[in-house]
Amino acid sequence: MRKEHDFLGELEVADELYYGVQTIRALENFHITGKHLDQDFIKALAMVKKASALANMKTGRLNVSIGKAIVQAADEVIEGQFADQFPVDPIQGGAGTSVNMNMNEVLANRACEILGHPKGSYDIVSPNNHCNMAQSTNDAFPTAIKVCAIIKSKPLLDALQRLVDELEKKAEEYSEILKMGRTHLQDAVPITLGQEMGAYASGIRRGIKRIKSAVEGAHVINMGATAVGTGLNAEPNYIHDVAYELSEVVGEPFYTAENLIDATN
């Protein structure tokens, strides 16, 4: 067992755990759904943390050896390691604070190990001062949601397009099959089964356009806004650098919102 402290006092943490005291507080405080975080979201949040560490190293604020250890830890989470170290309930107070700190603690403790120190050596790698540097739950968490949504949209759009293609084939195949159209639970006027299939395809195509439009908007992020959008505690160059680094990490173009206060609130 190791002992960790927060403003509420001291708690014992099992040696094998990569999360720490703030995650344990969340487990005690928020018994809401009994479910766990989506694994794609965990990976997306790790991508955000990786991009942030890279940007903070670029500005010179984050020590390079610490930053590289955080990046390695984030890469391991992205690869699917430590999946059992994110036990917090998806629904919790603080609009994602517990999730954010769960990630920060896992990355900090793994980074400590990478640097040759035991878990809980927060004087070496701090969940707050290093893993959450130039960040707030209010920018890191919503950005991770956007990254996750973009990633998940790809198989969804592929599946919907395949469905449209098949419905259009059926529209042609059934073009001469006549049936009654119905209104108010009664027979109304004739329509072909092919016309119905074509209408289904049209509706799904419209849905695809809406999803693509939403995905396009998700590429605008508020990283660097910190708590309320003013960028307090973030280096000026970081705000530009973190969008670039996230683009490189995810493989999608991300852009900083024109007004960070608006984007955050």
Which ranges hold each PLM region?
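Conserved, well-structured ligand/cofactor-binding cores
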Residues: 1-265
